[in-house]
Regions:
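PLD/PLD-like phosphodiesterase catalytic module centered on the HKD motif
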Residues: 1-19, 29-36, 42-237
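Core active-site phosphate/anionic-ligand binding loop and the adjoining beta-turn-alpha structural block
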Residues: 22
């Protein structure tokens, strides 16, 4: 039942540095150590917020050339909200897709005018979190289990993983681009906290529908169509 409603991202990699971090992380969990040191992974509650703050500062230093993209379920942490506000004031373009609770008001002149917030609620309950800092060759991309909430950053064990593979980054950028183009389920947050439906474009584009079509096309390439009942059920979904 859950699998029919929820979507998320997972990552399988042979990257040695990430593997070493993951091994150390689970060893630390086994002995109750929440203060481990990790080189590639972002790990809460001990260091994730500090490292995210440093990544935002990295973009602030670029001024108007800086860029941040965040896909989250929620953002409520005051420290990170303040840091994103600082980024906006420095001219950094901050693009956020926040499905649920969002405690930062975008497009407030002199404060958050460079922040744009969109919410997409559709057939599937999306749980993927994506963080991108910078663009093109300078981009640092992460997938994560953590929202920008105090409970995630300070009171839970959470992990963010860097994405180095060009092929995987391309797939994630495909998700981001489709959600940018969504004009059927997307709602844009205004400076007063209300939401307005996105109506750009002449043709209706639903990000979730497009991604489902991508998945079906990939399945057709990797496995030929069959008469098995499970395949027919999948086609009817």
């Amino acid at each position: 039942k859950t699998a029919r409603q929820y979507t998320d991202l997972s990552y399988i990699t042979s990257n040695r540095e990430i593997g070493m971090d993951a091994s150390a992380f689970f060893k630390d969990l086994a002995i109750g150590n929440l203060e481990g040191t990790y080189h590639r992974l972002l790990v809460a509650p001990n260091s994730m917020k500090t490292r995210i703050t440093a990544l935002i500062d990295r973009e602030i230093a670029k001024g108007p050339k800086g860029y941040i993209f965040l896909k989250l379920n929620a953002i409520t942490d005051l420290d990170l909200i303040q840091k994103l506000r600082e980024a906006s004031q420095a001219g950094v373009q901050v693009e956020m897709i926040v499905r649920g609770i969002c405690c930062i008001l975008p497009q407030v002149e002199g404060e958050t005018e460079n922040i744009r917030v969109t919410s997409i609620v559709g057939r599937y309950l999306e749980h993927a979190r994506i963080y991108c800092f910078g663009k093109d060759a300078e981009e640092l991309m992460f997938i994560s289990s953590a929202d920008f909430m105090t409970r995630n950053m300070d009171h839970r064990v959470e992990v963010g993983c860097p994405i180095d593979s060009p092929q995987v980054r391309q797939k994630i950028h495909r998700i981001i681009e489709l959600q940018r183009m969504d004009n059927t389920k997307a709602r844009r947050m205004r400076s007063d906290g209300t939401y307005r439906r996105v109506t750009t474009g002449k043709l209706p584009i639903g990000a979730q529908d497009a991604l489902m079509e991508d998945a079906m096309a990939a399945a057709n390439l990797s496995a030929p169509e069959t008469d098995h009942p499970w395949w027919k059920r999948l086609l009817r979904r």
